[in-house]
Design a protein with these regions (language model features):
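Active-site-adjacent loops and short helices of periplasmic peptidoglycan-processing enzymes
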Residues: 1-133
Length: 133
């Protein structure tokens, strides 16, 4: 990202943080330049659905390395289904590929798909990859 765009982005985020009625945390790193921007970056927040992007990154990393086949089928049984958003909870036992689970995790924020993919991606690996970035 060029310097002018970076300055605009930085200014917009800093303005939003000042105007926001609450506590906001944002951390950005331009992977091409190494530039970083952080507003309350040392504060801890509940991850909620924001964890879904790092999980997706880890799945992609493992697929690219050849250690994970996204076409692998996984059967999701009722005992692992959770409430909240998503469609898997409404189905009986269902067999889906890892790719399909990832698609549901991102497109409809499916919490059951997310939980299944956490086990596949391995949360320690997800955290390590995020630290590397």
């Amino acid at each position: 990202m060029n310097a002018i765009l970076w300055e605009k982005l930085s200014g917009s985020i800093e303005w939003a943080a000042e105007e926001f009625d609450g506590v906001m945390g944002v951390s950005i790193k331009d992977l091409t330049t190494g530039n970083t921007l952080s507003v309350n970056g040392d504060e801890q927040f509940l991850a909620a659905s924001s964890i879904k992007i790092p999980i997706l990154v880890e799945l992609h990393k493992k697929a690219k390395a050849g250690t994970l086949d996204l076409d692998t089928e996984v059967t999701v049984h009722d005992d692992v289904k959770v409430g909240g958003t998503g469609v898997i909870k409404e189905l009986g036992d269902v067999t889906l590929t890892i790719q399909d689970l990832a698609t549901l995790m991102i497109t409809v924020s499916d919490n059951t798909a997310t939980n299944v993919l956490i086990d596949i991606a391995v949360m320690d690996d997800v955290n390590a990859t995020m630290e590397e970035l």
